[in-house]
């Protein structure tokens, strides 16, 4: 008799547990934990970085080789934007950009190399700790040229320490 009672008690307990579980709300499948943030070209937001706004550096006296640069903007974990003077020719601005890149490479531990050979006159390439810059399609490119305003933009792969990128740009234009 005791065995029967114990069995019934066990069955009742199991039924009660099952019933109480069925009242719980189903887990939501739409929630995502720490979604990866895509870096979008021309979209100047922090993209998950620990900063409040994009930082713009302009109106600074540059050395002779960097005088065409009117502004540099960098967003940690996202991108670097170098805007050259509108009253200069494409080739002048390209030379300026390449000099700026070379200067940064020589003066920063965060850059691992520079290569401007065999590229179009509007492109210059460099790497930050071996991570190439990529475009919106994820293709490995290193710069984007915009005919309208001589804007050159460099985009970092996600996960790269953008604070280092920002620091070398700041160093490049202040020394």
Where are these regions (language model features)?
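Positively charged n-region of N-terminal signal peptides that target proteins for export
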Residues: 1-6
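N-terminal hydrophobic targeting segments that direct proteins to the cell envelope
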Residues: 26-30
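C-terminal motif of bacterial Sec signal peptides marking the signal peptidase cleavage site
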Residues: 17-20
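Short, solvent-exposed recognition patches
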Residues: 33-140
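Repetitive helical segments and hydrophobic/amphipathic motifs
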Residues: 11-12
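Bacterial signal peptide processing site
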Residues: 22-24
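A short, solvent-exposed beta-edge/loop patch
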Residues: 118-175
């Amino acid at each position: 008799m005791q065995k029967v009672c114990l069995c019934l008690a066990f069955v009742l307990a199991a039924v009660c547990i099952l019933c109480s579980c069925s009242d719980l709300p189903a887990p939501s499948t739409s929630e995502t934990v720490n979604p990866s943030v895509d870096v979008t070209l021309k979209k100047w937001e922090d993209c998950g970085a620990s900063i409040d706004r994009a930082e713009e550096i302009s109106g600074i006296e540059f050395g002779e080789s960097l005088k065409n640069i009117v502004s540099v903007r960098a967003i940690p974990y996202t991108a670097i934007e170098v805007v050259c003077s509108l009253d200069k020719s494409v080739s002048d601005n390209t030379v300026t950009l390449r000099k700026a890149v070379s200067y940064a490479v020589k003066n920063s531990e965060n850059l691992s190399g520079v290569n401007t050979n065999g590229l179009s006159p509007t492109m210059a390439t460099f790497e930050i700790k071996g991570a190439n810059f990529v475009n919106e399609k994820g293709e490995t490119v290193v710069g984007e040229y915009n005919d309208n305003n001589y804007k050159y933009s460099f985009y970092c792969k996600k996960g790269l320490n953008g604070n280092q990128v920002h620091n070398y740009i700041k160093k490049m234009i202040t020394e």
